Amino acid sequence: MIATQSKSLVLGIIYFTWMTLLASAKEYHVGKSGSDQNDGSAARPYQTISAAALVAQPGDVITVHEGIYRERVNPPRGGKSDKKRITYQAASGEKVEIEGSEVVTNWEKVQDDTWKVTLPNRFFGAFNPYADLIHGDWFLRKGRDHHTGAVYLNGNWLSEAAVLESVLKPTGTNALWFGRVDPETTTIWAQFKDVNPNEQLVEINVRQSVFYPDKPGRNYITVRGFTMRHAATPWAPPTAEQIGLIGTHWSKGWIIENNVISDSACVGVSLGKYGDEWDNKSESADAYNRTIQRALTNGWNKATVGHHVVRHNTISSCEQAGIVGSMGAVFSEITSNHIFNIWTKRQFNGAEMAGIKIHASIDVVIEHNWIHDAGRAMWMDWMAQGTRISANLCYSNSTDDLFLEVDHGPVLVDNNIFLSPTSLRICSQGGAFVHNLIAGKIYLNAYDKRQTPYHKEHSTAVAGLHDNPGGDDRYYNNLFMQSGDLSPYDTAKLPVWMGGNVFLAGAKASRCETDPLLKPDFDPAIHLVEMPDGLYLELMQDLDWRMERTRTVVTTKSLGKAAIPGLPYETPDGSSVRINTDYSGIARNAANPFPGPFENPASGKQLVRVWRSAAR
């Protein structure tokens, strides 16, 4: 009886506490017709998101109503836990835009298609993008200056000219702009072909970011349902503070979901590093190792940093990366994002360009993303350990679909569709490639002398440093076609394991695989087809491939351990991995799974939906 009463008392306390939390949580409203002197109720909304952010407390929700909000949201605090977070959301069914730009009028015609406008420097406040040079570690300027400013005509991003004389010429393929900052004013020249800019929508970058806290440790924030664009973001190398159009700034537990994010001078979404006095002064492997040690003393651990969720976003038109994160992305999930048109202007270059560029993807899951026209789709640079890259669709990426650079693993790459001219670029060890469709080239780096970290199990704690010989990779049950070629592994320095792979239409096996299934005359006739309900992959397969070889379901046990860290291939929570579903989530045949990412094909031509169209 006493035990029953005690249990009832505990349950009552829990219920009372939960109801108290619910009762204390508030919803604040923001609307274009509101006022920042209002109380934020539905009847008396604030006018700016920033005003609501100042009063919101853990557990509160900020609902923003339709309109364009030209402001930088700097959340002054975060939530207390995953259950008591601060949520910023667009009102259901309403289009809410947050922009780092301002509308500019009063353009004066100079000649032909060239116009100019002169603005007082106070228009920009403390930050002027037209005086802000893009620079930093591993940045390649191509012999000219680049600024974080931008000019948009009816939403179209003009290209920055290197010199004013270029803007004064007739408009070529790409319309140009040029800026000059004097002590009191900023003048912008721009080409507006066949239009009067005073009769069009012309916007210019003014703010460095759109949603970014000015200090680290603003945890447990949700940002949902917005269109966010136009940010004068800086170059974001792994050795500096990484500011994105939206960014988490060295915090924990953010959810960034169902947003449209575009038009960033450098980075769209940052899950990145804090800033310090060593920013952009560490352009070497040894210096980055020192950066890592400083991060460990600055709270880089499982309890403090990472655990973010970035899902169902559309990210485009960023000239460095769609998503970036140096050490701050650990233990995160990046899923179901459409990332495209990254690094398209190609006016500058550097070692940080990708759809997704992560340093230290420790226990990070990158799954079901659609990445194309991004230069490089995914780049796991240093410290990919416990990383899973699963069921991603990558094509039309000019550099490669996946680059693993100086990682020691374990990294599991399964059920992906890699269709770009180069599928894999491997300068690492400890990778497991399982049930992928690989149509492009595979580059294997024989040896890299850089000493890079490996970590204790499911931890940021550094266990040691090691150089990077090629090998210690596993390839099981993959479907190679066209340029897919495993022969670079014939001379790998470390052992490799291969089995159950199929090679079509000129794809080449490695001598390391004892019994590959070779079908040199089989044409998969592969191409993508857009339909109203999504994107489909059309290809030819043959059911006989199942019967011609016996394959087994790939598991933690069958993969063994990555050699250098001595760790198994398992999930972030430490449970065993079993590759028993395919790209679409269909159960694998437990007795003899089919090669490649699709488990139940039909012989001959078939259409497989690889991306489902859905409203945000």
What role is predicted for each listed range?
Residues E27-W250, I255, V260-S262, S270, ...:
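Extracellular polysaccharide-degrading/modifying enzymes targeting complex plant/algal/animal polysaccharides
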Residues L11-T20:
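Bacterial N-terminal signal peptides
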Residues N74, S81, S209-F211, T233-H249, ...:
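Glycine- and acidic/polar-rich repeat regions and solenoidal domains
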Residues A23-A25:
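Boundary at the C-terminal end of the N-terminal hydrophobic targeting segment
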Residues M1-K7:
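N-terminal secretory signal peptides that target proteins for export/translocation
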